[in-house]
Amino acid sequence: MKHARFIWILLANSFLTAGSVQAEKNIITTGSTDQTTQQNMLQTAQNQLTNTGRSAGVIHTPTAAGNPVQDAKPGTFYQRARSYSTHPETDPPRYVRNLAKTGIDAFKDLYWLDVGLDHRVRYELRNNDLRRDRITTDHPVLLRTRAYVGIREILDPLRLVVEFEDARRYHGKFPKDNRDWNEFELIQTYGELYFRGALGQDDLGNHRPIRIRGGRMAWEALDRRLLGNNQWRNTTNNFEGFRVTLGQEANDWEIDGWGMQLVIRLIDEFDRRNKSQWFYGAIGHWRKWSEVVTLQPYYMGLMQDDKGGTQAKREIHSPALRAYGVLPGTEIDFDLSTVYQFGRDNGQKKAAWAYFLEFGHTFQQLSWKPRISAFYGFVSGDRDPNYNVNNRFERFFGFARPWSADDYFVPENIKAPKIRLEFQPHTDLRIDGGYNGFWLASKTDRFNNLLNGRGGNRDRTGNSGDFLGHAIDLRAIYKLTSHVNATVGYSRWFNGEFVKNRQLATLGETASGSNFFYVEVSVSAFK
């Protein structure tokens, strides 16, 4: 633990020093009047160009973390966050193409049909996986196939979507679970009423539509921390209910609201919705000032009945605010969120909170466009198991990565500082890596995923400590062809005192840490 703290101090100092050096570089002058005049003229020209671009409806997008540098769509207020791995899946999903735009001459008139087909295979080497209830080495192979068909425009205002998924895990030592296994399942089947110009237009001439959807849906929102379909995981979060959206991503404002019931993934049967639970919410997007900041106030709620005394009765309310953008005149980006939760949870009062802070700097003058960032996340845990107030944060249906590359963590009872570096040495190659530390927010609450999520993952006395461990990770993503992407990754985890103590208490043995290596290949039918 002492070594971990020393490393954190060293990395934090390096990050601040890099920022200071860049700042000094920006303010050093030679004292030459001519050079100062030239700089002022250049800045004036840049400002005029920026204003001209805005009036023409062209907004430049900052470098997307872990993604190629690209301009935003012409005529859009939308700016993509630079923060690491916080970008929701597109709608429709990324592997889907409009047939008329595939370049296949036979399909050039099928503007009304969206289709997609992809397959992913991932080999994993998991040595001493913390999530398991025994210490061993496993070599699972995970397979996932998806197919999508969407009908648009030709039947407007009616639109239709069907998406299929088949997810399986082979060659593993552990029983099937619904994280990895969901055979022959429809993950989306919904109808949509789409009214293109129902709310007029924004200042850039973009139509402000109304969309009303009903049926089974899978989607991601905000930074994916509370609502995501878990692209890394083999199976997909999805829901049944309704969703209403006012506006679109290109507009200066947009409102998205829903009322849903979670779909329970069943291994040997067709999935079905959880009739005893409702998940609802609304998200506002304010993009009028998106060249500096995008604001996303939102609310999420969960209502669950006791199902005849067989489960906890819950009523949880969660107001929140997210703000992301780039500091004017710099390449320093930020992504800030705060969430508060209140209500009733199994007869107890609910009082939980979380906040997420990320600051980064992109070196645009370098050809590889490296970005270095610092992140800190705090998610509350239950402070006192004997008190009638529950402080454990409700994570709703968010993603687990990139809390850790090992997929060990969920947003619950955690303090997590991180330092990351991302760069793109080639058009088709992206690389990122980082150093991460993890502590319990409350040492009397649980580490959710430890030991298969069972009783050994909590010490109500707090005597097992609060340090979970630290990790280093590295990942490379390479576009082999226009249809094939390959990803190789490695993570080394070092056990902290809490993990060692709980493994000893539960298993009678422990290890110094764990290793996780994987190779993933994704194949899409269309470019």
Model-identified regions with their sequence ranges:
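Extracytoplasmic loops and strand-loop junctions of Gram-negative outer membrane beta-barrel proteins
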Residues: 97-101, 128-133, 172-175, 224-227, ...
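Outer-membrane beta-barrel and related beta-rich outer-membrane complex signature
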Residues: 129-131, 174-176, 226, 269, ...
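Transmembrane beta-strands of outer-membrane beta-barrel pores
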Residues: 121-127, 153-157, 164-170, 216-220, ...
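Outer-membrane beta-barrel "beta-signal"
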Residues: 58, 76, 511-527
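N-terminal periplasmic/intermembrane-space "pro-region" immediately following the signal or transit peptide
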Residues: 2, 6, 13-138, 148-150, ...
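Surface-exposed loop and membrane-interface regions of Gram-negative outer-membrane beta-barrel proteins
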Residues: 125-143, 153-210, 225-228, 341-346, ...
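Signature for the C-terminal beta-barrel architecture of outer-membrane proteins
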Residues: 189, 194-209, 225-386, 444, ...
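Extracellular/periplasmic loop regions
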Residues: 66-84, 91-93, 338-341, 348-462, ...
